[in-house]
Regions:
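Conserved ABC ATPase "signature" region
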Residues: 119-137
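Catalytic Walker B motif of ABC-type/P-loop ATPase nucleotide-binding domains
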Residues: 166-169
Length: 279
């Protein structure tokens, strides 16, 4: 598989006042994201994960180093719209992403702005709304919807552009448990359909669903690997003020007490399967 995103020795520093000490939000990060993969980037508030996300499609530009999206340098102004069409982004607060008074018009906004034919736009809108199970709300006003429904509309707006990659920047942070579950099911479905997913989250039970987990701490990469590898490093994870998933924590406890628990037991489903063997 080829890489859809390459991050090369990225540094990022936010603008600061004359009396303020400069502080790097990202410090020398290098990553390669394979096309079709599902990566979760986690970390405490202030770890740099959302700053990293915004560098991935040119919302922020490197202070040093480079980010390439399908070979395009995010600093190339002539390529910025191609970059954002390739790597779409869904934000934490859907209200920041909804722009129209009617749901179907909101989903159509992106395709309209990249010059898609009106007949094709209608087809894309219907397809995108069906993908997020919101087809029956197409003529509703977004402000009348729940937080989870609004987030689904925001996702549909990105899907309608048909990006190869979608960056989700804490998309469930403002939702209740049911809303979180619904959004994660949509994200997993999009990944199964071939879209590259980059999920920024602080929920460990979401991160374990990825193929790869990257832990950010103080602007740097602390850990990078499969969920099985990353969540077995419980002491290192706790040093970054994070918790391991409950299932992984139970598995670690069982291993410490002489039970041979396989390394892939990091989710509730895998733990249940393992425990059921002892019935």
């Amino acid at each position: 598989m080829e890489n859809i995103i390459k991050i090369d020795n990225l540094y990022f520093q936010y603008p600061h006042g004359e009396d303020e000490e400069p502080k790097l939000a990202i410090k020398g990060v290098s990553l390669e994201i394979e096309e079709g993969s599902f990566s979760a980037i986690i970390g405490q508030n202030g770890s740099g994960k959302s700053t990293l996300a915004k560098n991935l499609n040119g919302l922020l530009l490197p202070s040093k180093g480079a980010v390439y999206v399908s070979g395009m340098d995010t600093r190339d102004e002539d390529k910025i719209w191609d970059i954002r069409q390739t790597a779409g982004m869904v934000f934490q607060n859907p209200d920041n992403q909804l722009v129209s008074a009617i749901v179907e018009d909101d989903v159509a906004f992106g395709p309209e702005n990249i010059g898609i034919d009106p007949v094709e736009i209608r087809a894309r809108v219907d397809e995108a709304l069906d993908a997020v199970k919101m087809g029956k709300y197409k003529r509703k006003a977004p402000h009348l919807l729940s937080g989870g429904q609004k987030q689904r509309i925001a996702i549909a707006g990105v899907v309608a552009i048909r990006p190869r990659c979608i960056i989700f920047d804490e998309p469930t942070a403002m939702l209740d448990p049911r809303g979180r579950k619904d959004i994660m099911e949509i994200i997993e479905k999009l990944h199964r359909e071939g879209i590259t997913v980059i999920l920024i989250t602080h929920f460990m039970d979401e991160a374990v669903k990825a193929d790869r987990v990257v832990i950010m701490n103080k602007g740097e990469i602390l850990l990078d690997g499969t969920p099985e590898h990353v969540f077995s490093q419980d002491e290192l994870i706790r040093s970054a003020r994070l918790d391991v998933p409950m299932a992984a924590e139970i598995a670690i406890y069982l291993r410490e007490n002489g039970i041979d628990v396989p390394p892939e037991v990091v989710t509730a489903e895998r733990l249940k399967e393992f425990v059921c063997q002892y019935k």
